[in-house]
């Protein structure tokens, strides 16, 4: 298997270098969120009211490095989150009828590239947490549980608009921006975007509210392979191999601890 070691420098989600948050022409409602495991772990826990959620760096995508980064004897990998360079003018991919059948019932929202341009990290985590009932169902009274229930009957575009107006989700995002923000925001000059990958009935599904119009089936979990291994293979083939050795990618694993977490 081809070995890939990732460069996991701290990055932020900036889908447009003309963002008001960078130009000083007024502060956008959603500010850039750091991609550190600490920040995203805090985000997942706050959205779900569950301390067992954690986010890990993934340092490489071959089996040995995956096993070092995510010990699935003590936790279960629910999703991989990819941070990758975004491209201006990239078209939105339309999902096929077959994909719609295979992903029926999955929760998906569209990301407005204007108002929600810097919310892609939070959207990726929300997408992951809302679609991993097989790992751990959302608590109905949690911030995200209530938001998903309230918007379940809406279209993906309507859900995106509702997220923009949701104080329950935005307040968590804003608090973590303040806690995590440093000189990174000022020094960041490369646009990046987040997408998440989850399993649905043996399929690896990509959830990207900016560049897909619905859940996209991008791979299969073959017999004898784990979701973690299958999703890592998809990321390698779809994103890293075509990039010809570019290093500005980050992969993180969203995991759920088997045992309760006790914090002092």
Show which residues each predicted segment covers.
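Intrinsically disordered, low-complexity terminal segments enriched in Ser/Thr
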Residues: 1-14
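Cysteine-dependent deubiquitinase/ubiquitin-like isopeptidase catalytic cores across multiple families
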Residues: 18-264
């Amino acid at each position: 298997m081809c070995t890939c070691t990732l460069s996991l420098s701290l990055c932020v989600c900036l889908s447009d270098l003309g963002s008001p948050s960078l130009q000083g022409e007024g502060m956008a409602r959603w500010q850039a969120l750091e991609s550190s495991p600490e920040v995203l772990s805090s985000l997942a826990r706050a959205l779900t009211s569950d301390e067992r959620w954690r986010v890990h760096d993934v340092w490489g995508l071959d089996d040995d490095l995956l096993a070092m980064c995510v010990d699935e004897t003590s936790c279960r990998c629910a999703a991989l989150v990819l941070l990758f360079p975004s491209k201006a003018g990239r078209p939105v991919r339309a999902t096929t009828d077959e994909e719609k059948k295979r992903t029926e019932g999955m929760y998906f929202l569209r990301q407005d590239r204007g108002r929600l341009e810097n919310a892609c990290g939070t959207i990726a985590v929300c997408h992951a947490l809302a679609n991993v009932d097989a790992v751990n169902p959302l608590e109905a009274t949690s911030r995200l549980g209530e938001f998903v229930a309230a918007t379940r009957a809406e279209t993906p575009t309507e859900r995106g608009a509702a997220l923009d107006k949701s104080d329950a989700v935005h307040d968590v995002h804003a608090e973590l921006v303040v806690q995590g923000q440093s000189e990174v925001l000022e020094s960041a000059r490369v646009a990046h975007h987040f997408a998440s990958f989850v399993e649905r009935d043996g399929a690896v599904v990509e959830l990207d509210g900016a560049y897909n119009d619905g859940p996209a089936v991008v791979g299969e979990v073959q017999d004898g392979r784990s979701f973690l291994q299958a999703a890592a293979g998809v990321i390698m083939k779809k994103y890293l191999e075509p990039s010809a050795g570019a290093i500005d990618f980050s992969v993180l694993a969203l995991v759920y601890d088997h045992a309760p977490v006790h914090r002092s």
